[in-house]
Amino acid sequence: EATTFSYQMGIGLETSFTGEDSLSATIDIGEAAGVGTGTTTGLNFDSNANVLTLDGLSYTFPLGGATVVVGDQTDISSVYTGACAYSAFTDYMGNCGTGNTVGVEGQGVTAAMSYAFDSGFSLAGGISSEPAQILTNTGTDIYGIEAAYTADSYGVSVAYADNEASTAWGINGFYAFDFATISAGVESVDTGTTAEGFFVGLSFPEVGAGSLDIGMGTTANFADGAAETYMYEASYSYPLNDGMTITPGVFITEGAGPGGADVT
């Protein structure tokens, strides 16, 4: 038995040339637990070398009534509206379980565009390619498109993604009650075999001095008949001051291990 400490810090830098555009950079530094001494399973630790790393560089600007973003290490979904009101503690629960579609990432160099209509409806889409093989036959490109509708108390988002090796559909949404908001998502990925996953969570915006989130879902998309693994989490976020918020949380995974026995 061993105890380890892991950390990650992100620095976001942003400037504007016209007041309507923005040039953004994200710098990460961190140290994650090594193999055999612990695990960061479920937590989004991108850096483990204890050195500063440029995690993303993007330029966002208006084009007519649309918004365009181009960048390196930039997610296609950075222009998506989404409809997930849940504040995830673990990476698995991010985007309400639709990380391959509504939360589709980038392959490297990314160009994406979104347009928001006055009615609450929005459309977005983009493409991302490997930096050295942009739109070539040998490179891997990711295409994504999203349609969303949001109102004061509810919203829904549907997205499709294609990375040449697989296609995926995802949908997430939320509904706000007076005391809490429920969010849910489902996703289906086809690589020749269809795999599916789901998420559901509750967000309580006013619990004491902070807010409480409780959720559960699959840790990935699983094919029919495959042994599924589930994750349960709870987190409480509260502000220490105007510039700092602390979010302690707990999570547990549960599924079938060797021989079909349950493993937690």
List where the protein language model places each region.
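Beta-barrel outer-membrane channel/assembly domains of diderm bacteria
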Residues: E1-D75, T90-E130, G139-T140, I145-D152, ...
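Short, well-ordered, mixed-charge alpha-helical segments that flank or form enzyme active sites
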Residues: I76-Y80, A132-I134
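Long, hydrophobic, well-ordered secondary-structure blocks that form the structural core
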Residues: Y80-Y92
